[in-house]
């Protein structure tokens, strides 16, 4: 979920990309029709933030759809800090080695994003409870962030916004409520909302504010519900 502004926000943003090795073949990212302003949907999206739209379109058109290219395109707030070390278990034969690598990877992310007020977490597959049957050291767990990995950021006073892919079996609002409940249970922080985005695949953006940022983030989400962005993003408040 890219912030719809090039300006520096009142709070500094950090991003953990959860970058994993490229997979071939992989259909992820093939749906880019929305970045064609000659289409009805593309034209509507561009009106929301022309500079952001054009920046993303230029990255896709260049063929270099990397984290570095995204940063170079200037589509993020000016003082954003990012962590994009690859999360891979290649060469890690056993569970102990994989678990240790993941702990070290998270430690590096924490060090890189020290000083950021809000941290955006962007795993390919979304969020999982820490007691999920496929634990974080599983060879195929790298596409997910586990809720307990968000705890160290929150514990040192950073609010977290985390991207999550919904599943097809349950209604999205039900999934959002369950996700917010899981986060409250595991992290001891009261979620503010989950923001739903339906273009392409449905995603939720879980908003976990620390007390110092709660009122500011609540005002921003309330403003979003009355803005043109409300046609694209649905705020599901915590009940």
Task: Mark where each language-model region is.
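Class I S-adenosyl-L-methionine-dependent methyltransferase catalytic core
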Residues: 1-239
């Amino acid at each position: 979920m890219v912030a719809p502004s090039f300006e520096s926000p009142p709070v500094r943003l950090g991003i953990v990309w959860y970058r994993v090795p490229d997979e071939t073949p992989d259909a992820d990212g093939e749906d880019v029709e929305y970045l064609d302003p000659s289409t009805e949907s593309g034209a509507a999206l561009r009106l929301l933030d022309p500079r952001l739209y054009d920046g993303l379109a230029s990255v896709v058109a260049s063929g270099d759809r990397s984290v570095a290219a995204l940063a170079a395109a200037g589509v993020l707030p000016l003082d954003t800090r990012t962590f994009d070390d690859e999360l891979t278990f290649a060469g890690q034969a056993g569970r102990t080695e994989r678990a240790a690598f993941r702990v070290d990877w998270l430690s590096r992310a924490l060090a890189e994003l020290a000083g950021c007020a809000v941290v955006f977490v962007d795993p390919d597959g979304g969020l999982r409870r820490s007691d999920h049957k496929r634990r974080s050291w599983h060879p195929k767990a790298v596409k997910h962030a586990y809720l307990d990995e968000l705890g160290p950021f929150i514990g040192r006073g950073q609010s977290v916004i985390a991207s999550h892919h919904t599943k097809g079996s349950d209604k999205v609002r039900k999934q959002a409520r369950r996700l917010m409940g899981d986060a409250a249970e595991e992290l001891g922080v009261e979620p503010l909302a989950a923001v739903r985005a339906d273009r392409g695949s449905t995603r939720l953006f879980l908003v976990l504010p620390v007390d110092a940022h709660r009122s500011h983030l609540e005002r921003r989400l309330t403003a979003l519900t009355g803005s043109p962005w409300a046609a694209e993003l649905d705020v599901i408040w915590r009940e």
